[in-house]
């Protein structure tokens, strides 16, 4: 009975899917990241956006304004002086918002881990969704991290589950 109804509706040209899947697909295939390049990892992020790797084919369009972005890519060494600025930029982004931590320095302090002026991982300031390892990570690793975030967005259960309150 259900299969017959599904076939009849499909034959008439209607699309049957849940709103969650449709909205999550749209979100995952049109990510607009805000770049927060702090060190040498930013060069690899620019390389990933150039013509050889072309992140545009994944729906990734880099934005210069946090109000137009839904993803922030933190690339490089985060210092104590820069941490409040990063948090302010993150707070200006509309919900749902996601964070990618790119490189060893952003993930855990990296080479400068024991320095008094370095934050030992941007996850102490922001809730990180995807970590991209490497020093600096390759453009392929950046692409893989973006694809992992797309998978994570597609797995979200409800339309509003991405609008979770973050501290």
Swiss-Prot record:
Quaternary structure and interacting proteins, as annotated: NDH-1 is composed of 14 different subunits. Subunits NuoB, C, D, E, F, and G constitute the peripheral sector of the complex.
Residues at which [4Fe-4S] cluster binds: 40-41, 105, 135
Reaction(s) the record says it catalyses: a quinone + NADH + 5 H(+)(in) = a quinol + NAD(+) + 4 H(+)(out)
Top-level taxon of origin: Bacteria
Summary of the function given for this chain in its UniProt record: NDH-1 shuttles electrons from NADH, via FMN and iron-sulfur (Fe-S) centers, to quinones in the respiratory chain. The immediate electron acceptor for the enzyme in this species is believed to be ubiquinone. Couples the redox reaction to proton translocation (for every two electrons transferred, four hydrogen ions are translocated across the cytoplasmic membrane), and thus conserves the redox energy in a proton gradient.
A Pfam family of this chain: Oxidored_q6
Keywords linked to the UniProt accession: 4Fe-4S, Cell inner membrane, Cell membrane, Iron, Iron-sulfur, Membrane, Metal-binding, NAD, Quinone, Translocase, Transport, Ubiquinone
A GO CC term attached to the entry: respiratory chain complex I
Cofactor(s) listed: [4Fe-4S] cluster
The enzyme's E.C. designation: 7.1.1.-
Protein's name according to its UniProt entry: NADH-quinone oxidoreductase subunit B
Topology of the protein relative to the lipid bilayer: Peripheral membrane protein
Intracellular or extracellular location(s): Cell inner membrane
Family stated for the protein in its record: Belongs to the complex I 20 kDa subunit family.
Cofactor stoichiometry and binding remark: Binds 1 [4Fe-4S] cluster.
Protein's organism: Magnetococcus marinus (strain ATCC BAA-1437 / JCM 17883 / MC-1)
